[in-house]
Amino acid sequence: MTTPINSLRGLSRDSVWDYENGFYWFSDQSRINKLLAHYELYRRIVDLPGDVVEFGVFKGLSLIRFAQFRALMETDQSRRIVGFDAFGKFPSEGLARAADRDFIARFEAAAGHGLARDELGAVLREKGFGNIDLVAGDVFETLPRYLASRPELRLSLLHLDMDVAEPTRFVLETLYDRVVPGGLVVIDDYATVAGATDVVDDFLRDRGLQLRKLPNYRTPAFIVRP
């Protein structure tokens, strides 16, 4: 039997209704806009084969959201959800762009570090979500290993939220051809973080692709694979 989680990162189960009220009292409208955007994008893939794969899990918000949408619209066995992340401190070694390094410093000062893999795994078990892989480590090492273990992998939705240039480029170039026709590449950082934005622009130009957005918010942007 799984031991219930009563508190995590200073938040307590006993105050859950206060947190929900506080969200609606104080959060910016953009938080609801993004939730609706994610819902609409997930709805578009329910008749497509392929897994949902996210890069940049952080504290698990969007991954849990996708798992909840899967539970509402499909089942755990409809598709796997995979989350890649360092699961801790934002990796900054080897970043060539000063703007990317500055962004990471500002982001961590404001938002702190992401959840550890074990912490997020416990949350997912608590919520009853199955068929989810959490892959921890440097994406330049973990993604090739994961693909070697699952050469059949195809994606219905690729969610990129890594902020900076080098890993965004690596994942796009490695996984785009595994996205099924009609599948989505969803980019959280386009026109908000310089590194990821420049990489996406280069990729669109090289591949002759079109970037789209939904009407209710400026992010995420997305590509529909022809």
Where in this protein do the model-derived segments appear?
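Conserved alpha-helix/loop element of class I SAM-dependent methyltransferases that forms part
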Residues: 37-47
